[in-house]
């Protein structure tokens, strides 16, 4: 833990309060260039997306960004109806401007999952599969349970939540801890230079929050990946947490 520097309460509150603004600025700066399309999800979790038979299912992708998961998924499974939301209005505009946007298949909307009721927007628990990919890590721990309950409220009984996110012990967490820059909120949560939050999940925490929100565990695993950072000419060994829960 050498070099670790904790933020003052003032800055912790400020970063938490300005999270939405920080992400919207992120999309103003990076537009659609930052995240790569995610082509692995349908391969690793095909049965949750109605594959291989291309069954007509209803999906909700929360924290969808500019659609890096939505459009690759729709390409391999055109029978999906995909609701997708993000709290950055700019990100949602990019989803709508995408060349593959199809208003009969893709339904983007602005929503802060920590406080805006998804049930009010969707009207009923109509979701077969909800995807939360690198979004819950942007939310402070005290808001996790409330947010996950919000997600649970729109999933059909027997439907699934598919999760992948940062894991405790990951290379990026070690970097925060040794950088010397003041970035720590608590041992699991850090602030990036652009003001966005990054929570590194412990298995026991996410398992407890999901259980309390009415989910039964299907799988929860650590996955190791080597990620290329071409700009910095780096190969990073990353550890993510990946899981599936069933709405009881
Ligand atoms: C790391 S990006 C992941 C984007 C996308 N899921 C993907 O896998 O490429 C995190 C996204 O979550 C969104 N986000 C963060 N907190 C949120 C919240 N409270 N409600 C809705 N979206 C949120 C951010 O705006 C950002 O687009």
Curated annotation (Swiss-Prot):
GO CC term (a single one): nucleus
Sorted UniProt keywords: Cytoplasm, Methyltransferase, Nucleus, Transferase, tRNA processing
Keyword Cytoplasm applies: yes
GO molecular function terms listed in the Swiss-Prot or TrEMBL record: tRNA (cytidine-3-)-methyltransferase activity
Keyword Signal part of the UniProt annotation: no
Ligand binding (S-adenosyl-L-methionine): 23, 27, 63, 86, 112, 133
One annotated GO biological process: tRNA C3-cytosine methylation
Subcellular location: Cytoplasm; Nucleus
Superkingdom of origin organism: Eukaryota
Disruption-associated phenotype: Cells lacking trm141 show abolished N(3)-methylcytidine modification in tRNA(Ser). Cells lacking trm140 and trm141 show abolished N(3)-methylcytidine modification in tRNAs (tRNA(Ser) and tRNA(Thr)).
Gene3D superfamilies assigned: Vaccinia Virus protein VP39
A Pfam family recorded for this sequence: Methyltransf_12
CDD domains named among the record's database cross-references: AdoMet_MTases
Main location: cytoplasm
Catalytic activity: cytidine(32) in tRNA(Ser) + S-adenosyl-L-methionine = N(3)-methylcytidine(32) in tRNA(Ser) + S-adenosyl-L-homocysteine + H(+)
Family membership noted in the UniProt record: Belongs to the methyltransferase superfamily. METL family.
Function: S-adenosyl-L-methionine-dependent methyltransferase that mediates N(3)-methylcytidine modification of residue 32 of the tRNA anticodon loop of tRNA(Ser). N(3)-methylcytidine methylation by trm141 requires the formation of N(6)-dimethylallyladenosine(37) (i6A37) by tit1 as prerequisite. Does not catalyze N(3)-methylcytidine modification of tRNA(Thr).
Protein name, entry field: tRNA N(3)-methylcytidine methyltransferase trm141
Organism the protein comes from: Schizosaccharomyces pombe (strain 972 / ATCC 24843)
């Amino acid at each position: 833990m050498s070099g670790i520097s904790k933020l003052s309460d003032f800055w912790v509150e400020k970063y938490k309060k300005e999270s939405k603004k920080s992400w919207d600025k992120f999309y103003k700066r990076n537009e659609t260039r930052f995240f790569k399309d995610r082509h692995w999800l349908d391969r690793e979790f095909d049965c949750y997306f109605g594959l291989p038979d291309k069954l007509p299912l209803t999906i909700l992708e929360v924290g969808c960004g500019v659609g890096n998961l939505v459009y690759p998924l729709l390409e391999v499974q055109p029978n999906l109806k995909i609701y997708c939301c993000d709290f950055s209005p700019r990100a949602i505009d990019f989803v709508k401007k995408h060349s593959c946007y199809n208003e009969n298949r893709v339904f983007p909307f602005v929503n802060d999952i920590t406080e805006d009721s998804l049930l009010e927007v969707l009207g009923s628990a109509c979701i077969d599969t909800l995807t939360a990919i690198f979004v819950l890590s942007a939310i402070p721990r005290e808001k996790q349970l409330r947010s996950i309950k919000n997600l649970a409220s729109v999933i059909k009984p027997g439907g699934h939540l598919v999760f992948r996110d940062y894991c405790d012990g990951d290379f990026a967490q070690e970097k925060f801890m040794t950088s010397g820059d003041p970035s720590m909120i608590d041992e699991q949560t850090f602030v990036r230079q652009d003001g966005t939050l990054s929570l590194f999940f412990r298995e026991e925490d996410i398992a407890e929050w999901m259980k309390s929100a009415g989910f039964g565990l299907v799988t929860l695993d650590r996955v190791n990946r080597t990620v290329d950072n071409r700009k910095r000419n780096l190969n990073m060994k990353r550890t993510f947490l990946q899981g599936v829960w069933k709405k009881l």
